[in-house]
């Protein structure tokens, strides 16, 4: 059943259910974090974390992170004079926008940019962006570029001449893209932000995104743990449920402890971001580092306790493990964030 439900969407071009995306808009979920001036509800990191925790429990495929959290945050907090037009289309679900900031061999450093925006009156963009979330479905891209040694964000349409897109499927069945810009013409009114404003917007959007995927991982862990407990109670060996075996009970307790540890760090990060404390970046790095380690442990133990069925397409457990692996590498893995935490 799980396989059939999932395959209905993961093998389509979009990789998610468009009808569910429309429902997200109708329920007001797409408007949650936007300011009231932009037509949103002024919800913050606490509410978004709760939402993403639920996303994690059910392995939601819809591209909320790329559209609302990353691109939405940058647009909503920028001084871009056309932002409300694009935000209203994001909120209604009419348009999708992806952030393109990752480049090859840059070790998660968003300031180290090789994509060049050159010229004065007539601007030309050249370069490549990798690992663009939901790139195949985006109508526009927020692209970080180097313009005269200054970090700049430009808005580029998917139909722009000189832009070629290569699409890929990730280990957890999400969609990412590589964007290649070759002599792409850029007008001055496509510049969203530049200089310190651009760098702060990207930094905060990434921190927001890191919090959200970490909350998603916490939801995944909770679901993994509960499904594993339920499975071990129903599977029998030697005339009794395998949940009666003490060594398996200890392993499930360890899974519970890992999930609760991450949940405590999540609450700390949510509060620091809600109060806009100076420690918000450090708190999120501590959370992300632990989530990467705990998530893989919980996922691997869940698969082991399910036996061979744990890695089958028919059961959700193996898909949780794949999601843990993907989340660990997103926005910096455990070791990257541990180093960032130690240096802050």
Language model regions located:
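Alpha-helical interface subdomain recognition
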Residues: 1-59, 78-82, 89, 93-94, ...
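Short glycine/proline-enriched turns and hinge-like loops at secondary-structure junctions
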Residues: 43, 109-111, 134-138
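Residue-level signal for inorganic ion chemistry
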Residues: 51, 99, 127, 143, ...
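N-terminal glycine-rich flavin-associated loop
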Residues: 60-81
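Short beta-strand-to-turn element immediately C-terminal to the catalytic PLP-Schiff-base lysine
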Residues: 75-79, 143-146, 155-158, 180-182, ...
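A short, Trp-centered hydrophobic/proline-enriched beta-strand micro-motif
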Residues: 93-104
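Flexible, small-/acidic-enriched active-site or ligand-binding loops
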Residues: 108, 112-114, 131-132, 157-191
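A short core secondary-structure module
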Residues: 126-163
């Amino acid at each position: 059943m799980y396989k059939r439900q999932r395959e209905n969407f993961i093998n389509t071009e979009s990789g998610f259910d468009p009808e569910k995306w429309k429902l997200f808009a109708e329920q007001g979920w797409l408007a949650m974090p936007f300011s009231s001036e932009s037509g949103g509800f002024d919800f913050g990191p606490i509410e978004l974390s709760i939402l993403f925790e639920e996303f994690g429990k059910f392995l939601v495929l819809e591209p909320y992170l790329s559209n609302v959290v990353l691109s939405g945050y940058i647009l909503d907090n920028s001084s871009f004079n056309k932002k409300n037009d694009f935000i209203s289309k994001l909120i209604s679900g009419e348009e999708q926008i992806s952030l393109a900031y990752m480049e090859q061999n840059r070790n998660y450093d968003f300031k180290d940019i090789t994509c060049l925006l050159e010229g004065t009156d007539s601007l030309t963009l050249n370069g490549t962006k990798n690992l663009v979330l939901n790139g195949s479905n985006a109508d526009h891209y927020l692209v970080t570029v180097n313009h005269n040694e200054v970090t700049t964000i430009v808005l580029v349409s998917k139909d722009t001449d000189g832009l070629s897109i290569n699409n890929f499927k990730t280990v957890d069945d999400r969609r990412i893209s590589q964007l290649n810009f070759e002599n792409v013409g850029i007008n001055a009114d496509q510049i969203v932000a530049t200089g310190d404003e651009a760098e702060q917007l990207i930094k905060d959007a990434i921190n927001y995104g890191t919090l959200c995927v970490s909350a998603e991982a916490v939801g995944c862990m909770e679901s993994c743990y509960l499904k594993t407990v339920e499975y071990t109670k129903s599977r029998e060996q030697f005339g009794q449920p395998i949940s009666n075996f003490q060594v398996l009970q200890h392993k499930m307790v360890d899974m519970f402890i890992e999930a609760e540890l991450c949940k405590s760090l999540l609450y700390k990060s949510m509060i620091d971001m809600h109060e806009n404390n100076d420690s918000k970046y450090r708190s999120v790095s501590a959370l992300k580092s632990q989530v990467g380690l705990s998530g893989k442990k919980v996922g691997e133990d869940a698969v082991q306790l399910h036996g061979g069925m744990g890695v089958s397409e028919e059961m959700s457990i193996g898909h949780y493990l794949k999601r843990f692996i993907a989340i660990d590498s997103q926005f910096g893995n455990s070791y990257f964030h541990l180093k960032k935490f130690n240096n802050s």
